[in-house]
């Protein structure tokens, strides 16, 4: 496997945190030593251990001299968790491959700079577009301090949103409905018109889908 393939695996891991990490980003990490994956992890919930620490903790052998693949630049500041760069240095990681640079002003290149200052080989921007897209909501908020808003509108081919009796349940297909549920799981709030509340109040949540 090459750098892109390992990063793609890290992306798959990161997506497991979808809906649980906000306002933090989704992050995945993979530890590779001598061509073998010896550890992997992701940021599972806001306030809990970050992906890098989870990946290092899961290692089946000493990670010293290994390569760490991570979808987002490792943090270098104290928050609810200690800096990930400290864990990387303590583990003796030889090389770090990063997908996205972290736009958070508390990081913003500082994490990578610290790693390089300690002699770690850092490769940047591997699958950057995919890694950036994964956290577009986080990137938007951290750089603008404004909420990321997504609008959903469903209507029939002739422009209707319901039958005149109000008896209609769905006008969208199963694929569209599942997509909406996945989107709801990603967002922290749902805004509707007042007329929707008495009709659909109990349904204004993310329902389970098979995807």
Regions found by a protein language model. Name each.
Residues 10, 28, 75, 115, ...:
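Residue-level signal for inorganic ion chemistry
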Residues 4-20:
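Short, basic/aromatic recognition patches
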Residues 100, 194-195:
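Short secondary-structure boundary segments
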Residues 137-192:
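Phosphate/diphosphate-binding glycine-rich loops and adjacent basic-rich segments that engage nucleotide
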Residues 31-130:
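Zn2+-dependent cytidine deaminase-like catalytic core
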Residues 23-26, 148-149:
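Short, small/polar residue-rich loop motifs at catalytic or cofactor-binding pockets
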Residues 27-32, 153:
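Short beta-strand scaffold segments in enzyme catalytic cores
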Residues 202-209:
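Conserved small/polar residues in nucleotide/adenosyl-binding loops
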């Amino acid at each position: 496997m090459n750098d892109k393939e390992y990063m793609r695996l890290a992306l798959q891991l990161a997506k497991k945190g979808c809906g649980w990490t906000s306002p933090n980003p989704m992050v995945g990490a993979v530890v590779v030593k001598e061509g073998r994956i010896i550890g992997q992890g992701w940021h599972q919930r806001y306030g809990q251990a970050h992906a890098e620490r989870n990946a290092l903790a899961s290692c089946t052998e000493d990670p010293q001299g290994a390569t760490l693949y991570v979808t987002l630049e490792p943090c270098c500041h104290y928050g609810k968790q200690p800096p990930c760069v400290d864990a990387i240095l303590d583990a003796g990681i030889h090389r770090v491959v990063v997908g996205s640079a972290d736009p958070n002003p508390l990081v913003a290149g500082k994490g990578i700079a610290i790693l390089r200052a300690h002699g770690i080989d850092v490769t940047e921007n591997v699958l950057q577009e995919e890694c950036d897209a994964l956290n577009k909501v986080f990137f938007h908020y951290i750089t603008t301090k404004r909420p990321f808003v997504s609008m959903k509108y469903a209507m029939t081919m002739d422009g209707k949103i319901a039958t005149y009796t109000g008896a209609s349940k769905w006008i969208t297909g199963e694929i569209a409905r599942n997509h909406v549920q996945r989107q709801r799981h990603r967002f922290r709030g749902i805004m509707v018109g007042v007329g929707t509340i008495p009709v659909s109040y109990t349904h204004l949540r993310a329902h389970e889908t098979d995807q």
